[in-house]
């Protein structure tokens, strides 16, 4: 009648209700039937909704039954459209039956996996740690040292009982002979070396070494002079520092012992150099480094030493100088005590240049008490290295 459509709406054949996609709920529910498993059990029905599926813990016996009902839950409704044709749709009223079936299959598999995982975890036995935590009770063991030392004697069977040991050497005790025979007494003397085989017991050192040999050896030892090098280790002036390094390399290559005196580490060396060169310079003014001396004889500076080395005269001048032994500091080896610095901190004041004298102490030569200047080190609290600067 009027402008309204008089065409009847599609109705469901089962419930005779109108089909409208607007009023269809988004969640679905299903009925799961649980038959009686034991005598006396009742037949009951459980309604499952989409929000509860996945949160229930199922036992292994009802797993297959639940999966079967999930497949049967897709009941189909026949809907007649305006043309009179019937269409099969799923239970929620929409035309997406395949997607909902896939979702339910996935949920069933997830539930089945959870059930199997929980079952496996229950069957796996828990391993208990076998390491003991508490110390077992018991009395401490007593060790008898006398039993362990039994059989060990002070005298070894491989060593004579008359063998004595000193701190630095071994010797054998010789039993005194009660026989007055001279030949037997001589047989107990220490063995002589080959050098003394043909020498009489009454000979003296003067008979072996003539006096002229001893005097020549003493004169040769005392007559050796050292090469004294005055230099600086400061790098403020680059040319001066490089000249000092070059002269040190030239002198060390000759294998002689050098008395290196660093004027930057000890002001006393600077005063010595001024006193030695006051005749060559204007009262020691304008002295440059390095400077080389052979004893008290002045050899020259950097230019003179280079020229003497190139001409071969430097090696002739120092032929009587003391040579450096192999492996000792100065022969290409660094001093282990000072590291080729030639100075070490003072052992008395530890480099502080101060000593404290208490009034109660009665030291010889101490007239004042309190903090005093250390008399053993220089102005920098350093002393000469006792290893390489003997």
From Swiss-Prot:
Pfam families, A to Z: Glutaredoxin, GRXCR1-2_C
Boundaries of every Glutaredoxin domain copy: 215-325
Coiled coil start-end: none
Transmembrane segments annotated in the record for this chain: none
Name assigned to this protein: Uncharacterized protein At5g39865
């Amino acid at each position: 009648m009027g402008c309204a459509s008089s065409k009847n709406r599609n109705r469901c054949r089962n419930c005779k209700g109108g089909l409208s996609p607007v009023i269809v709920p988004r969640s679905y529910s299903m009925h799961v039937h649980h038959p009686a498993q034991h005598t006396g059990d009742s037949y009951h029905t459980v309604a499952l909704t989409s929000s509860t599926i996945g949160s229930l813990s199922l036992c292994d016996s009802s797993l297959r039954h639940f999966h079967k009902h999930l497949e049967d839950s897709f009941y189909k409704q026949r809907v007649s459209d305006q043309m009179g044709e019937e269409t099969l749709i799923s239970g929620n009223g929409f035309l997406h039956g395949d997607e909902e079936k896939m979702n339910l299959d996935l949920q069933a598999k997830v539930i089945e996996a959870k059930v199997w995982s929980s079952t496996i975890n229950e069957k796996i036995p828990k391993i208990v740690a076998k390491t003991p935590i508490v110390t077992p009770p018991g009395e401490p063991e007593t060790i008898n040292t006398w039993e362990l030392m039994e059989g060990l004697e002070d005298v070894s069977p491989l060593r004579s009982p008359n063998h004595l040991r000193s701190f630095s050497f071994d010797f054998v005790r010789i039993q005194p002979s009660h026989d007055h025979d001279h030949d037997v007494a001589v047989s107990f003397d220490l063995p002589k070396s080959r050098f003394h085989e043909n020498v009489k017991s009454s000979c003296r050192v003067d008979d072996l070494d003539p006096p002229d040999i001893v005097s020549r050896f003493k004169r040769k030892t005392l007559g050796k002079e050292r090469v004294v090098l005055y230099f600086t280790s400061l790098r403020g002036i680059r040319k001066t520092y490089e000249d000092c390094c070059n002269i040190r390399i030239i002198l060390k290559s000759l294998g002689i012992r050098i008395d290196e005196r660093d004027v930057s580490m000890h002001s006393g060396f600077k005063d010595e150099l001024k006193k030695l060169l006051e005749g060559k310079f204007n009262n020691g003014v304008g002295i440059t480094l390095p400077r080389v001396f052979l004893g008290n004889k002045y050899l020259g500076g950097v230019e003179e030493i280079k020229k003497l080395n190139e001409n071969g005269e430097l090696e002739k001048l120092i032929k009587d100088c003391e040579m450096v032994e192999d492996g000792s500091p100065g022969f290409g080896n660094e001093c282990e005590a000072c590291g080729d610095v030639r100075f070490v901190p003072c052992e008395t004041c530890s480099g502080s240049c101060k000593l404290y004298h208490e009034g109660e102490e009665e030291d010889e030569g101490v007239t004042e008490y309190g903090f005093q200047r250390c008399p053993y080190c220089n102005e920098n609290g350093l002393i000469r290295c006792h290893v390489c600067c003997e």
